[in-house]
Every structure is written in C-alpha cells, then in structure tokens.
Amino acid sequence: MKRHKKTLRMAIFLFQLLWGIYATEVQAQETPAMIDQPIIWTENREQLILQYAQTHYGLSETHIVPQAVVVHWTAGDTWESAYWTFYHEDRGDGTLNVASHFIVDRDGTIYRLTEETALNRHAIGYNWCAIGIENVGGVDGEEDLTQEQLEANVQLIRYLHQKYPTILYVFGHYQQDIARDSGLYIEHVDGYHSIKSDPGPTFMRGLRLNLENDGLIFYPEKF
C-alpha cells in the first residue's frame, strides 16, 4: 500500500510538472512579442485619471476591468510621434492627456505603453472599460494600415481576450455610436462627443474575419 501511494504521489508530481511546462509553452506561443515603452506615470497622472473618471463616469477608479478593445489609427507616420503625444500627463490645460495602451507600428511591432488595465483616455464613453490599440497610419484620413499591422492586431486582441475573458467587444473608433448597443457607453458630460473615422472599415473587416470565431462581438464595418 505504501508503495502504491508513493507511486501515485510520483505520478501526480510528474503530471503537475509536465502540465506546468505545457502551460508555460502555450502561454509563450500565445503571447505576441511586444516592447514595453512606458509613458510617464506618476501620482499626478493617477490623480488626473481619478478626476476624469469621476467627472465622466461617476467612478472613483484608475484601473479597469476590460470589456472591450477599441482600435484606432494615429493619423501620423511614426510610432514615436504617437508615443510622445501620449507621454506627458496633461494636455497643457491641466486636464488628463490622451493615451492608449498599445501602439502598433507599420511593420507590426507592438509597443506597450501602460498597464493593460490602466484607465487611459482614448475613446469617449468607453475609457472606463476599454483597452486601446493605436495603429501608426491614417494620415489625412487615408486607409493605409498594413497587413503586418492587421496580423499584429489579431495576435494582440487574441492574447488580450485569452488573458481577460471579460472582453466581449471589438470595434473601431469610428464605430463608437453603434457600439452603444453593447450597453458599455457611459458619459456624464452633455455634448461631449467627437466624430471619428479610424481605423476604417477595411481594417475592421480584416479583424472580424480573423477573430469572429473567437467568441468576440463585432459591428457592421460600414460608416
């Protein structure tokens, strides 16, 4: 009996060891390569985030439970220009600066700028629950995002969905109005709204075709 118990314990140990190795390998395969390039993050930024969340959402939070991914373009031609736009804490008037969680360069390189659950200002009405991905391009409103960016976005969104099962929705910034059907939109400031065209229907169609079987909800691509 003692011998049997010893054998059983050894079998359980080996299973746990092998499962740990397998899980680590799977995680490594599913996590896309990315470069951490943090923007400045201080107590002052946290305070500005808190003020923004209280004013616009009635929430006293600086972090989110991710429920959506909002896809953008930068309207610029380098990742550095977008990075330095997001880098500082305020917009010069003392209000919270815009920022996104990720930037994807033209060649598909992914830069992570903040914690994935930080509350960043990138999409009116959804910042309290959405992760933002900025794609370099869209200068003068041209739909010019690359295949490499599409593939990187697919990998990144799939990784985020696996890491945060609370994520159900993926939409482009220009789809912000129809995305209100999700029930996620909150805005307490009257008239606070903007019209967007990024990242365009072609890119969003590509994302939908690659990810619609992953249990994510998309919206019609047309403007």
Features from the language model and the residues they span:
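Basic/polar, cationic surfaces and motifs that engage anionic cell-wall
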Residues: 29-45, 139-223
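N-terminal catalytic cores of peptidoglycan-degrading enzymes
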Residues: 24-123
